[in-house]
Protein backbone atom coordinates (compact mmCIF):
# COMPACT_ATOMS: atom_id res chain seq x y z
CA UNK A 1 0.00 0.00 0.00
CA UNK A 2 1.03 3.64 -0.32
CA UNK A 3 1.60 6.02 2.58
CA UNK A 4 -1.82 7.69 2.13
CA UNK A 5 -3.63 4.36 2.48
CA UNK A 6 -1.48 3.52 5.51
CA UNK A 7 -2.40 6.84 7.11
CA UNK A 8 -6.12 6.14 6.76
CA UNK A 9 -5.66 2.64 8.16
CA UNK A 10 -3.79 4.00 11.20
CA UNK A 11 -6.57 6.54 11.85
CA UNK A 12 -9.22 3.83 11.64
CA UNK A 13 -7.21 1.61 13.97
CA UNK A 14 -6.84 4.40 16.51
CA UNK A 15 -10.61 4.96 16.49
CA UNK A 16 -11.31 1.23 16.81
CA UNK A 17 -8.87 0.62 19.68
CA UNK A 18 -10.11 3.66 21.62
CA UNK A 19 -13.85 2.97 21.44
CA UNK A 20 -15.58 3.22 24.83
CA UNK A 21 -18.85 2.07 26.34
CA UNK A 22 -21.33 4.28 28.19
CA UNK A 23 -19.28 3.90 31.37
CA UNK A 24 -16.13 5.19 29.64
CA UNK A 25 -14.37 1.80 29.53
CA UNK A 26 -12.38 0.75 26.47
CA UNK A 27 -14.32 -1.93 24.57
CA UNK A 28 -11.54 -3.30 22.34
CA UNK A 29 -9.71 -6.12 24.19
CA UNK A 30 -6.21 -4.93 25.07
CA UNK A 31 -4.84 -8.39 24.31
CA UNK A 32 -6.09 -8.08 20.70
CA UNK A 33 -4.73 -4.59 20.09
CA UNK A 34 -2.00 -5.50 17.66
CA UNK A 35 0.80 -2.93 17.24
CA UNK A 36 1.13 -1.50 13.73
CA UNK A 37 4.41 -2.24 11.95
CA UNK A 38 5.20 -0.10 8.91
CA UNK A 39 7.86 -1.63 6.69
CA UNK A 40 9.19 0.31 3.73
CA UNK A 41 12.18 2.01 2.12
CA UNK A 42 13.76 5.02 3.85
CA UNK A 43 12.51 8.55 3.29
CA UNK A 44 8.93 7.86 2.17
CA UNK A 45 7.23 9.54 5.15
CA UNK A 46 6.65 6.80 7.73
CA UNK A 47 7.52 9.13 10.62
CA UNK A 48 5.75 12.15 9.13
CA UNK A 49 2.51 10.22 8.72
CA UNK A 50 2.43 9.50 12.47
CA UNK A 51 2.66 13.22 13.20
CA UNK A 52 -0.18 13.89 10.76
CA UNK A 53 -2.42 11.21 12.28
CA UNK A 54 -1.79 12.46 15.83
CA UNK A 55 -2.58 16.04 14.83
CA UNK A 56 -5.71 15.18 12.84
CA UNK A 57 -7.08 12.85 15.53
CA UNK A 58 -6.22 15.22 18.38
CA UNK A 59 -4.11 12.70 20.31
CA UNK A 60 -0.61 12.77 21.76
CA UNK A 61 2.51 11.49 20.04
CA UNK A 62 5.70 10.16 21.58
CA UNK A 63 8.30 9.18 18.97
CA UNK A 64 11.60 7.39 19.56
CA UNK A 65 14.34 6.14 17.29
CA UNK A 66 15.19 2.98 19.15
CA UNK A 67 18.73 2.69 17.75
CA UNK A 68 19.62 5.69 19.94
CA UNK A 69 18.74 3.77 23.10
CA UNK A 70 20.41 1.22 25.34
CA UNK A 71 18.70 -1.57 27.23
CA UNK A 72 18.86 0.51 30.42
CA UNK A 73 17.02 3.51 28.95
CA UNK A 74 14.36 1.26 27.40
CA UNK A 75 13.77 -1.10 30.31
CA UNK A 76 14.86 1.06 33.24
CA UNK A 77 17.69 0.80 35.75
CA UNK A 78 17.90 -2.10 38.23
CA UNK A 79 17.53 -1.45 41.94
CA UNK A 80 17.49 -3.74 44.97
CA UNK A 81 14.35 -3.76 47.10
CA UNK A 82 13.31 -5.85 50.11
CA UNK A 83 10.29 -8.18 50.02
CA UNK A 84 8.84 -10.64 52.50
CA UNK A 85 7.92 -14.09 51.15
CA UNK A 86 6.50 -16.82 53.44
CA UNK A 87 7.62 -14.83 56.44
CA UNK A 88 11.17 -14.55 55.17
CA UNK A 89 12.70 -11.19 54.16
CA UNK A 90 14.63 -11.31 50.87
CA UNK A 91 16.33 -8.83 48.52
CA UNK A 92 15.15 -8.79 44.90
CA UNK A 93 15.84 -6.75 41.77
CA UNK A 94 13.26 -4.33 40.37
CA UNK A 95 13.54 -1.88 37.51
CA UNK A 96 12.83 1.83 37.52
CA UNK A 97 10.24 3.17 35.09
CA UNK A 98 11.35 2.96 31.47
CA UNK A 99 12.42 6.29 29.97
CA UNK A 100 10.08 5.60 27.04
CA UNK A 101 7.05 4.85 29.23
CA UNK A 102 7.90 7.89 31.38
CA UNK A 103 7.86 10.03 28.22
CA UNK A 104 4.31 8.84 27.52
CA UNK A 105 3.17 9.97 30.98
CA UNK A 106 5.06 13.26 30.55
CA UNK A 107 3.21 13.84 27.27
CA UNK A 108 -0.14 13.10 28.94
CA UNK A 109 0.62 15.53 31.76
CA UNK A 110 2.02 18.24 29.49
CA UNK A 111 -0.72 18.19 26.83
CA UNK A 112 -3.68 16.88 28.80
CA UNK A 113 -4.19 14.20 26.13
CA UNK A 114 -4.86 10.81 27.70
CA UNK A 115 -4.72 8.94 24.39
CA UNK A 116 -2.02 8.89 21.76
CA UNK A 117 0.51 7.04 19.63
CA UNK A 118 3.78 5.60 20.88
CA UNK A 119 5.94 5.38 17.77
CA UNK A 120 9.21 3.43 17.69
CA UNK A 121 11.31 3.99 14.56
CA UNK A 122 13.97 1.63 13.16
CA UNK A 123 12.63 -1.12 15.40
CA UNK A 124 14.25 -3.92 13.40
CA UNK A 125 17.72 -2.34 13.70
CA UNK A 126 18.11 -2.64 17.47
CA UNK A 127 21.29 -3.92 19.09
CA UNK A 128 21.59 -7.56 20.11
CA UNK A 129 21.12 -6.72 23.81
CA UNK A 130 17.92 -4.77 23.12
CA UNK A 131 16.34 -7.23 20.65
CA UNK A 132 14.57 -9.39 23.31
CA UNK A 133 13.17 -6.23 24.90
CA UNK A 134 11.68 -5.11 21.58
CA UNK A 135 10.10 -8.51 21.04
CA UNK A 136 8.58 -8.31 24.51
CA UNK A 137 7.35 -4.80 23.73
CA UNK A 138 5.60 -5.86 20.52
CA UNK A 139 4.15 -9.02 22.04
CA UNK A 140 3.09 -7.76 25.50
CA UNK A 141 3.03 -3.93 25.13
CA UNK A 142 5.47 -3.58 28.01
CA UNK A 143 8.98 -2.28 28.62
CA UNK A 144 10.37 -4.38 31.45
CA UNK A 145 7.59 -4.65 34.03
CA UNK A 146 5.86 -1.43 32.98
CA UNK A 147 2.94 -1.41 30.53
CA UNK A 148 2.08 1.19 27.92
CA UNK A 149 -0.93 3.17 29.28
CA UNK A 150 -4.41 2.36 28.01
CA UNK A 151 -5.55 4.47 25.08
CA UNK A 152 -2.10 4.52 23.47
CA UNK A 153 -1.62 2.86 20.09
CA UNK A 154 1.75 1.22 19.58
CA UNK A 155 3.23 1.80 16.13
CA UNK A 156 6.65 0.94 14.82
CA UNK A 157 8.57 1.33 11.58
CA UNK A 158 11.51 -0.35 9.96
CA UNK A 159 13.37 -0.81 6.69
CA UNK A 160 13.54 -4.04 4.67
CA UNK A 161 16.92 -5.87 4.72
CA UNK A 162 17.88 -4.66 1.24
CA UNK A 163 18.06 -1.08 2.55
CA UNK A 164 19.84 -1.66 5.85
CA UNK A 165 22.52 -4.21 6.75
CA UNK A 166 21.73 -3.86 10.47
CA UNK A 167 18.23 -5.26 10.06
CA UNK A 168 17.15 -8.17 12.26
CA UNK A 169 14.38 -10.36 10.88
CA UNK A 170 11.35 -10.88 13.12
CA UNK A 171 10.30 -14.46 13.78
CA UNK A 172 6.81 -15.78 12.98
CA UNK A 173 5.78 -15.63 16.65
CA UNK A 174 6.37 -11.86 16.67
CA UNK A 175 4.91 -11.20 13.20
CA UNK A 176 1.77 -13.07 14.27
CA UNK A 177 1.23 -10.42 16.96
CA UNK A 178 1.57 -7.26 14.82
CA UNK A 179 -0.20 -5.69 11.85
CA UNK A 180 2.45 -5.44 9.18
CA UNK A 181 1.92 -2.85 6.44
CA UNK A 182 4.36 -2.86 3.53
CA UNK A 183 4.68 0.72 2.23
CA UNK A 184 5.76 1.59 -1.29
CA UNK A 185 6.79 4.93 -2.78
CA UNK A 186 3.91 6.45 -4.78
CA UNK A 187 4.50 9.64 -6.78
CA UNK A 188 0.80 10.48 -7.28
CA UNK A 189 0.16 10.40 -3.53
CA UNK A 190 3.31 12.40 -2.83
CA UNK A 191 2.29 15.05 -5.38
CA UNK A 192 -0.95 15.67 -3.45
CA UNK A 193 1.14 16.13 -0.31
CA UNK A 194 3.65 18.29 -2.21
CA UNK A 195 1.05 20.87 -3.22
CA UNK A 196 -0.06 21.19 0.41
CA UNK A 197 3.54 21.61 1.57
CA UNK A 198 4.40 24.16 -1.15
CA UNK A 199 7.18 22.05 -2.62
CA UNK A 200 9.26 24.08 -5.11
CA UNK A 201 7.51 24.36 -8.48
CA UNK A 202 10.59 23.21 -10.41
CA UNK A 203 10.52 19.90 -8.51
CA UNK A 204 6.83 19.33 -9.23
CA UNK A 205 7.32 20.15 -12.91
CA UNK A 206 10.39 17.92 -13.18
CA UNK A 207 8.76 14.92 -11.51
CA UNK A 208 5.74 15.38 -13.76
CA UNK A 209 8.09 14.65 -16.68
CA UNK A 210 10.51 12.21 -15.05
CA UNK A 211 8.30 10.05 -12.82
CA UNK A 212 10.93 7.32 -12.52
CA UNK A 213 13.33 9.83 -10.90
CA UNK A 214 11.08 10.27 -7.85
CA UNK A 215 12.47 7.40 -5.80
CA UNK A 216 15.58 5.33 -6.37
CA UNK A 217 17.76 3.33 -3.98
CA UNK A 218 20.64 1.21 -5.25
CA UNK A 219 23.55 -0.57 -3.57
CA UNK A 220 26.45 -1.32 -5.89
CA UNK A 221 30.13 -2.17 -5.58
CA UNK A 222 30.80 1.52 -6.23
CA UNK A 223 28.69 2.67 -3.30
CA UNK A 224 25.16 3.63 -2.29
CA UNK A 225 23.10 5.78 -4.67
CA UNK A 226 19.71 7.04 -3.62
CA UNK A 227 17.00 9.62 -4.20
CA UNK A 228 14.08 9.70 -1.74
CA UNK A 229 10.89 11.65 -1.10
CA UNK A 230 12.58 13.15 1.96
CA UNK A 231 15.46 14.30 -0.25
CA UNK A 232 13.12 16.11 -2.65
CA UNK A 233 11.29 17.84 0.20
CA UNK A 234 14.49 18.93 1.95
CA UNK A 235 15.90 20.14 -1.38
CA UNK A 236 12.76 22.23 -1.90
CA UNK A 237 13.29 24.04 1.39
CA UNK A 238 16.94 24.91 0.67
CA UNK A 239 16.06 26.07 -2.86
CA UNK A 240 13.41 28.47 -1.56
CA UNK A 241 15.74 29.78 1.14
CA UNK A 242 18.65 30.30 -1.28
CA UNK A 243 16.41 32.04 -3.82
CA UNK A 244 15.12 34.46 -1.18
CA UNK A 245 18.70 35.20 -0.10
CA UNK A 246 19.93 35.53 -3.69
CA UNK A 247 22.45 32.70 -3.22
CA UNK A 248 23.54 30.84 -6.36
CA UNK A 249 22.14 27.33 -6.81
CA UNK A 250 24.86 24.90 -7.95
CA UNK A 251 24.91 21.31 -9.16
CA UNK A 252 26.95 20.39 -6.09
CA UNK A 253 24.12 21.64 -3.86
CA UNK A 254 21.60 19.51 -5.75
CA UNK A 255 23.91 16.48 -5.43
CA UNK A 256 23.95 16.85 -1.65
CA UNK A 257 20.23 16.03 -1.60
CA UNK A 258 19.84 13.82 -4.68
CA UNK A 259 22.58 11.25 -4.19
CA UNK A 260 22.52 9.85 -7.69
CA UNK A 261 24.64 11.76 -10.19
CA UNK A 262 22.50 11.33 -13.32
CA UNK A 263 19.31 12.43 -11.53
CA UNK A 264 21.03 15.37 -9.81
CA UNK A 265 22.52 16.48 -13.14
CA UNK A 266 19.21 16.09 -14.97
CA UNK A 267 17.25 18.00 -12.34
CA UNK A 268 19.82 20.81 -12.16
CA UNK A 269 19.51 21.36 -15.93
CA UNK A 270 15.72 21.35 -15.60
CA UNK A 271 15.89 23.81 -12.68
CA UNK A 272 17.96 26.25 -14.73
CA UNK A 273 15.46 26.04 -17.59
CA UNK A 274 12.58 26.50 -15.15
CA UNK A 275 14.08 29.75 -13.89
CA UNK A 276 14.90 30.90 -17.45
CA UNK A 277 11.42 30.17 -18.80
CA UNK A 278 9.90 31.91 -15.80
CA UNK A 279 11.69 35.09 -16.89
CA UNK A 280 11.13 34.59 -20.64
CA UNK A 281 7.38 33.99 -20.43
CA UNK A 282 6.65 36.50 -17.66
CA UNK A 283 3.82 34.32 -16.38
CA UNK A 284 3.33 36.36 -13.20
CA UNK A 285 2.44 39.39 -15.33
CA UNK A 286 0.28 37.19 -17.54
CA UNK A 287 -1.75 35.91 -14.57
CA UNK A 288 -2.12 39.37 -13.05
CA UNK A 289 -3.37 40.82 -16.34
CA UNK A 290 -0.47 43.27 -16.68
CA UNK A 291 0.77 41.76 -19.95
CA UNK A 292 -0.33 43.54 -23.15
CA UNK A 293 -2.23 41.56 -25.81
CA UNK A 294 0.58 41.89 -28.35
CA UNK A 295 3.14 40.50 -25.89
CA UNK A 296 0.79 37.65 -25.00
CA UNK A 297 0.62 36.62 -28.65
CA UNK A 298 4.43 36.49 -28.77
CA UNK A 299 4.45 34.20 -25.73
CA UNK A 300 1.81 31.97 -27.34
CA UNK A 301 3.92 31.60 -30.51
CA UNK A 302 6.98 30.89 -28.37
CA UNK A 303 5.12 28.10 -26.55
CA UNK A 304 3.64 26.65 -29.76
CA UNK A 305 7.11 26.05 -31.17
CA UNK A 306 8.61 24.89 -27.86
CA UNK A 307 10.13 21.50 -27.09
CA UNK A 308 8.35 18.85 -25.02
CA UNK A 309 10.34 19.79 -21.89
CA UNK A 310 9.72 23.52 -22.31
CA UNK A 311 5.97 22.96 -22.67
CA UNK A 312 5.84 20.91 -19.47
CA UNK A 313 7.94 23.41 -17.54
CA UNK A 314 5.73 26.30 -18.67
CA UNK A 315 2.70 24.33 -17.48
CA UNK A 316 4.46 23.76 -14.15
CA UNK A 317 5.21 27.47 -13.84
CA UNK A 318 1.54 28.32 -14.34
CA UNK A 319 0.45 25.76 -11.73
CA UNK A 320 3.04 27.02 -9.27
CA UNK A 321 1.98 30.64 -9.77
CA UNK A 322 -1.68 29.77 -9.21
CA UNK A 323 -0.84 27.70 -6.15
CA UNK A 324 0.69 30.76 -4.51
CA UNK A 325 -2.59 32.62 -5.06
CA UNK A 326 -4.65 29.72 -3.70
CA UNK A 327 -2.50 29.64 -0.57
CA UNK A 328 -2.89 33.40 -0.08
CA UNK A 329 -6.67 33.06 -0.30
CA UNK A 330 -6.76 30.06 2.02
CA UNK A 331 -4.75 31.94 4.65
CA UNK A 332 -7.01 34.99 4.33
CA UNK A 333 -10.12 32.82 4.52
CA UNK A 334 -8.93 31.05 7.69
CA UNK A 335 -7.99 34.34 9.34
CA UNK A 336 -11.33 35.93 8.47
CA UNK A 337 -13.21 32.89 9.75
CA UNK A 338 -11.20 32.86 12.99
CA UNK A 339 -11.88 36.58 13.61
CA UNK A 340 -15.60 36.01 12.94
CA UNK A 341 -15.77 33.23 15.55
CA UNK A 342 -13.96 35.42 18.06
CA UNK A 343 -16.35 38.32 17.45
CA UNK A 344 -19.28 36.05 18.33
CA UNK A 345 -17.60 35.40 21.70
CA UNK A 346 -16.79 39.10 22.07
CA UNK A 347 -20.42 40.09 21.53
CA UNK A 348 -21.52 37.84 24.39
CA UNK A 349 -18.62 39.07 26.55
CA UNK A 350 -19.59 42.75 26.05
CA UNK A 351 -23.26 42.13 26.85
CA UNK A 352 -23.08 43.16 30.53
CA UNK A 353 -19.98 45.38 30.32
CA UNK A 354 -20.11 49.13 30.91
CA UNK A 355 -17.55 50.37 28.39
CA UNK A 356 -15.13 49.31 25.64
CA UNK A 357 -12.21 48.83 28.01
CA UNK A 358 -13.68 45.32 28.24
CA UNK A 359 -12.23 44.67 24.77
CA UNK A 360 -8.73 44.85 26.26
CA UNK A 361 -9.79 42.43 29.02
CA UNK A 362 -11.11 40.05 26.37
CA UNK A 363 -7.85 40.30 24.40
CA UNK A 364 -5.77 39.62 27.53
CA UNK A 365 -7.78 36.45 28.18
CA UNK A 366 -7.06 35.36 24.60
CA UNK A 367 -3.33 35.97 25.10
CA UNK A 368 -3.24 33.91 28.30
CA UNK A 369 -5.20 31.11 26.65
CA UNK A 370 -2.77 31.05 23.73
CA UNK A 371 0.23 30.92 26.08
CA UNK A 372 -1.25 27.95 27.98
CA UNK A 373 -2.00 26.00 24.79
CA UNK A 374 1.46 26.71 23.39
CA UNK A 375 3.09 25.47 26.57
CA UNK A 376 0.96 22.31 26.38
CA UNK A 377 1.95 21.88 22.70
CA UNK A 378 -1.71 21.81 21.64
CA UNK A 379 -1.24 24.01 18.56
CA UNK A 380 0.69 23.49 15.37
CA UNK A 381 2.49 26.38 13.65
CA UNK A 382 -0.45 27.17 11.36
CA UNK A 383 -2.92 27.29 14.25
CA UNK A 384 -0.53 29.42 16.29
CA UNK A 385 -0.13 31.88 13.41
CA UNK A 386 -3.91 32.19 13.04
CA UNK A 387 -4.39 32.73 16.79
CA UNK A 388 -1.71 35.42 16.82
CA UNK A 389 -3.40 37.12 13.85
CA UNK A 390 -6.71 37.19 15.74
CA UNK A 391 -5.05 38.79 18.77
CA UNK A 392 -3.32 41.42 16.59
CA UNK A 393 -6.65 42.17 14.89
CA UNK A 394 -8.40 42.63 18.24
CA UNK A 395 -5.61 45.00 19.32
CA UNK A 396 -6.05 46.98 16.08
CA UNK A 397 -9.80 47.16 16.70
CA UNK A 398 -9.11 48.43 20.22
CA UNK A 399 -6.73 51.10 18.92
CA UNK A 400 -9.31 52.30 16.38
CA UNK A 401 -11.98 52.47 19.10
CA UNK A 402 -9.72 54.60 21.30
CA UNK A 403 -8.71 56.88 18.43
CA UNK A 404 -12.35 57.55 17.64
CA UNK A 405 -13.19 58.20 21.33
CA UNK A 406 -15.82 55.46 21.43
CA UNK A 407 -16.65 54.30 24.95
CA UNK A 408 -20.07 52.60 25.05
CA UNK A 409 -20.17 48.93 24.10
CA UNK A 410 -23.05 49.10 21.62
CA UNK A 411 -21.43 51.78 19.45
CA UNK A 412 -18.04 50.12 19.88
CA UNK A 413 -19.21 46.71 18.68
CA UNK A 414 -21.00 48.28 15.73
CA UNK A 415 -17.72 49.95 14.72
CA UNK A 416 -15.93 46.61 15.05
CA UNK A 417 -18.60 45.07 12.82
CA UNK A 418 -17.80 47.70 10.17
CA UNK A 419 -14.08 46.97 10.41
CA UNK A 420 -14.78 43.25 10.05
CA UNK A 421 -16.92 43.93 6.96
CA UNK A 422 -13.84 45.50 5.38
CA UNK A 423 -11.96 42.23 6.02
CA UNK A 424 -14.76 40.26 4.34
CA UNK A 425 -14.64 42.57 1.31
CA UNK A 426 -10.88 42.08 1.12
CA UNK A 427 -11.44 38.32 1.00
CA UNK A 428 -14.03 38.73 -1.77
CA UNK A 429 -11.63 40.88 -3.79
CA UNK A 430 -8.93 38.24 -3.39
CA UNK A 431 -11.30 35.53 -4.66
CA UNK A 432 -12.26 37.62 -7.70
CA UNK A 433 -8.59 38.23 -8.48
CA UNK A 434 -7.82 34.50 -8.38
CA UNK A 435 -10.85 33.68 -10.55
CA UNK A 436 -9.52 36.08 -13.18
CA UNK A 437 -6.05 34.50 -12.90
CA UNK A 438 -7.58 31.07 -13.52
CA UNK A 439 -9.41 32.33 -16.61
CA UNK A 440 -6.22 33.90 -18.00
CA UNK A 441 -4.26 30.70 -17.32
CA UNK A 442 -6.81 28.53 -19.14
CA UNK A 443 -6.99 30.99 -22.04
CA UNK A 444 -3.20 30.88 -22.39
CA UNK A 445 -3.09 27.07 -22.21
CA UNK A 446 -5.88 26.81 -24.79
CA UNK A 447 -4.14 29.25 -27.15
CA UNK A 448 -0.79 27.48 -26.83
CA UNK A 449 -1.66 23.81 -26.62
CA UNK A 450 -5.36 23.38 -27.40
CA UNK A 451 -6.59 20.16 -25.80
CA UNK A 452 -3.15 18.55 -25.87
CA UNK A 453 -1.33 16.66 -23.14
CA UNK A 454 -0.07 19.91 -21.58
CA UNK A 455 -3.68 20.97 -20.91
CA UNK A 456 -4.39 17.52 -19.50
CA UNK A 457 -1.39 17.96 -17.18
CA UNK A 458 -2.63 21.42 -16.18
CA UNK A 459 -6.15 20.22 -15.30
CA UNK A 460 -4.78 17.17 -13.50
CA UNK A 461 -2.44 19.39 -11.49
CA UNK A 462 -5.35 21.57 -10.37
CA UNK A 463 -7.42 18.51 -9.48
CA UNK A 464 -4.68 17.01 -7.31
CA UNK A 465 -4.04 20.31 -5.57
CA UNK A 466 -6.35 20.41 -2.54
CA UNK A 467 -6.04 24.22 -2.33
CA UNK A 468 -7.12 24.60 -5.97
CA UNK A 469 -9.90 22.03 -5.63
CA UNK A 470 -11.31 23.80 -2.55
CA UNK A 471 -11.28 27.20 -4.29
CA UNK A 472 -12.90 25.90 -7.49
CA UNK A 473 -15.51 24.03 -5.46
CA UNK A 474 -16.48 27.28 -3.69
CA UNK A 475 -16.26 29.77 -6.56
CA UNK A 476 -16.42 27.62 -9.68
CA UNK A 477 -14.36 27.89 -12.87
CA UNK A 478 -16.13 27.29 -16.21
CA UNK A 479 -12.95 26.54 -18.23
CA UNK A 480 -11.89 23.96 -15.63
CA UNK A 481 -15.25 22.19 -15.70
CA UNK A 482 -15.31 22.23 -19.51
CA UNK A 483 -11.83 20.68 -19.73
CA UNK A 484 -12.65 18.13 -17.03
CA UNK A 485 -15.75 16.99 -18.93
CA UNK A 486 -13.68 16.54 -22.09
CA UNK A 487 -11.09 14.51 -20.20
CA UNK A 488 -13.80 12.34 -18.65
CA UNK A 489 -15.39 11.78 -22.07
CA UNK A 490 -11.99 10.79 -23.49
CA UNK A 491 -11.44 8.29 -20.69
CA UNK A 492 -14.88 6.76 -21.19
CA UNK A 493 -14.36 6.62 -24.96
CA UNK A 494 -10.96 4.95 -24.54
CA UNK A 495 -12.40 2.42 -22.09
CA UNK A 496 -15.24 1.63 -24.53
CA UNK A 497 -12.75 1.16 -27.37
CA UNK A 498 -10.68 -1.22 -25.24
CA UNK A 499 -13.80 -3.24 -24.36
CA UNK A 500 -14.82 -3.42 -28.04
CA UNK A 501 -11.33 -4.56 -29.04
CA UNK A 502 -11.33 -7.26 -26.37
CA UNK A 503 -14.75 -8.51 -27.57
CA UNK A 504 -13.54 -8.66 -31.18
CA UNK A 505 -10.62 -10.85 -30.10
CA UNK A 506 -12.95 -13.45 -28.61
Regions found by a protein language model. Name each.
Residues 301-506:
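Terminal-proximal interaction/regulatory segments of ATP-powered molecular machines
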Residues 5, 9, 103, 189, ...:
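Exposed alpha-helical structural elements
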Residues 17, 26, 64, 85, ...:
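Sequence-level detector for tyrosine residue identity
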Residues 1-212, 220:
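AAA+ P-loop NTPase catalytic core and its hallmark functional loops
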Residues 2, 98, 171, 186, ...:
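Helix N-terminus capping/helix-initiation residues
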Residues 196-360:
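Alpha-helical lid/collar subdomain of P-loop NTPases
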Residues 4-7, 11, 20, 32, ...:
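Context-gated lysine
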Residues 10, 100-104, 242, 434, ...:
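Generic hydrophobic, helix-prone segments enriched in Leu/Val/Ile
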